[in-house]
Amino acid sequence: MRPILLSGHERSLTQIKFNRDGDLLFSVSKDKIVCAWWTANGERLGTYNGHLGAVWTVDVSPNTVLLATGSADNSVRLWNVKTGECVKVWEFPTAVKRVEFSPDGSQLLAVTEKRMGFLGAISVLDISYEDNFQNQADEPSLRITCNESKATVAGWSYLGKYIIAGHEDGSVSQYDAKTGDQLENVQAHEFDHQINDIQFSADRTYFITASKDKSAKLISSRNLAILKTYVADTPLNSATITPKKDYVILGGGQAAMDVTTTSARQGKFEARFYHKVFEDEIGRVRGHFGPLNTVGVHPNGTAYASGGEDGYVRVHHFDKPYFDFMYEVEREQMRK
C-alpha cells in the first residue's frame, strides 16, 4: 500500500474531505490555502485563494458544485468548485471551526468559537444553487447558541433531521435541525476532554467521535446510544468509518506541544485500524512525522487519506489483502 504524498501546504493540515464521488480530495491547513486534488494520482487541480487566516474546516456539496470553508479570519466562504471563484462570504464575530453541508446540500452549518464575550454557536445558512450561486442569504436561518459548553464539531444526521454536536466538555448533543431545540445530551467522553472530530456513516444513522481522552465512540444518531468504544493509547484528533469493510480508522498522536525529541514510533503518529464490530485494533499505518490531525475515507471504501501536523496529506489506495482480511466468524457468516 504505497501512499501518494501530497505536498501543497506549508503548515499543518486541519481537515481533509473527499467529495461524494471520491474522485476529488479537498484539504485545508493553517496556511490560508485550500487545495483540490485528484484522488487517483494525487495531482493538484488547483487552489481556492482568499482567506486571511488559518483555514480550520472544509466541506463540499453533495453534487460537488460548491465548496465551503471556515477560517480563523472569522468568515465562511463559499466557492465555485469548478472555477475557483469565491461566490459568497459570511462574516462571524469569532473564528469558524467546522462547516458541513446538509445531506441534500440545501443548507450549511457553521460552528463558531467562544471568544471575546461571544458564546459558541452553530449557525445554519440556506444555500441557493440558482443564478450562478450569486443570491445567497445574508443571515443564518437558524442559530443554536451553546450556553453550557461550546461546540467544537457538528454534523447532520440522516435526512438532515438532527444536528449532532460534539462539545469541549466531552459531551454530545442532538438538536432538532428545524427548530434548534436541544433534544438529547450525553456525556460520551471523559469530562473536560474535548471532542475533536465527528464523522458519520454513509447513511448518517450513526457516527464516530474522536476525543482527547484517547478513545473513539460509535454512537447512534437517533438516540445518542453509545454502540461501541475504541480505546487507543494516545489522544485522538480524528476518526472515520470505512464503507465496504467493517472498520474504523483513528488518527492522533501526542499533541504537538508535548512532543519533545521523540521518535515517530514513540509519538504514536500512526493511523490505527480497528474492527468496527469487535473493537479490536487490527493494524496501523505509519508514515507521518507528527500527529495525524485529520483522516478521511473514500466513499467507495477503496482508499483513505490522512493529513498531519507535518504539512503532508497521504493518500493510501487499499490493496487486495485489506479487502480479503476477515475474522473467522465473518467467514462462517459468508459460508452460510
Swiss-Prot record:
GO terms for cellular component: eukaryotic 43S preinitiation complex; eukaryotic 48S preinitiation complex; eukaryotic translation initiation factor 3 complex, eIF3e; eukaryotic translation initiation factor 3 complex, eIF3m; nuclear periphery. The keyword Protein biosynthesis applies. Pfam families: EIF3I (PF24805). PROSITE patterns: WD_REPEATS_1, WD_REPEATS_2, WD_REPEATS_REGION. WD repeats lie at residues 8-47, 50-91, 146-185, 190-229, 287-326. The keyword rRNA-binding does not apply. Keywords: Cytoplasm, Initiation factor, Protein biosynthesis, Repeat, WD repeat. GO terms for biological process: formation of cytoplasmic translation initiation complex. It comes from the Eukaryota. Gene3D superfamilies: YVTN repeat-like/Quinoprotein amine dehydrogenase. GO terms for molecular function: RNA binding; translation initiation factor activity. Component of the eukaryotic translation initiation factor 3 (eIF-3) complex. Component of the eukaryotic translation initiation factor 3 (eIF-3) complex, which is involved in protein synthesis of a specialized repertoire of mRNAs and, together with other initiation factors, stimulates binding of mRNA and methionyl-tRNAi to the 40S ribosome. The eIF-3 complex specifically targets and initiates translation of a subset of mRNAs involved in cell proliferation. This is Eukaryotic translation initiation factor 3 subunit I. It comes from Aspergillus terreus (strain NIH 2624 / FGSC A1156). The gene is tif34.
